Amino acid sequence: MPETASATRRHLRRAARSRGVSVAAPQLDFDWASRFLQRRTVPSVEMITGDQIERVVWLDTRRRPVAARAVRLCIRNELPRRTTTRQTIGRLTIAATPDLSAATLRAAIVRMFDLDADLGSFLAIARRDPVLAPVVATNPRGLRLLQLLDPFEALLRAILGQQVSVAAASTMTDRLVRRVGTPGPRAWTSDVVPLLRPRYAFPRPGAVAELGPARLRGLGLTRAKAAAVHGAATAVASGQLNLARLRVASPDEADRMLLSLPGVGPWTATYVRLRALGDRDAFPAADLGLIRALTALGVTRDRFQAAAERWRPWRGYATLHLWHSLGSGVPVLA
């Protein structure tokens, strides 16, 4: 019998507390982070329930690609839901099945929430800037660049999100995962958590490549999008696009690597840098949400780049706050 949402939350809470690792999360507005992630949830992979996140991910547990395995993570916000603006030091608890070392868990959560970013340096620039000052003032608890641990997932989600709504992109992604995703661990332990909704890790590149463009179109993708997804998967599976090299590439090199793929343009490449490569200076100048936000703040199109130059090396964080200024906290695309 399927469990209720409240029962699921209780099970996740027990799992996270029973064997979790606690990590300080300064200047993190978890309510905002939860809304950001909920809006783009892929149900077969992840579940967000307010103060908790459960996700099946590919995690390199021995720092070698061949050691990557599907892991179920449970992340819980230990900060009280209602906080004052002075309470900026929160804590996150992370647990995993199969069990992982404390160091591996800490590294994962720091990366997912970009917790090692010195937001003080960004805010020092933003609070002096005529465009950003009123924007950052509206969120004193802090926004952080939320990261996907798998660059391949970020790449495919960016392609699937081209020129469609967030909901449509999530639906297509979920269909792909259900078709060729890798089954993940089903429970924390038999006496703690029964079967939970997220059941799969994101598909491996080879599995997506084997589908071929025709079967990808059967999932609701356009001809062009199916070709782009297949091309990206084939490039990664064959080694033409080396994800290990992409992770450590300079921004210019990362752009060259990504833009060499069919159907990948500047917006998609920048999105991958923002969401998977931890590039805090990535700036998607052509993003419609960013354009709307800057226009609403009185910055004309011919002054976008000049304004952005003042925000280096934090243009990615400036982008995040500008998106948030629109009210939704997310870009127009996926």
Predicted regions and their residues:
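HhH-family (HhH-GPD) DNA N-glycosylase catalytic core used in base-excision repair
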Residues: M1-A334
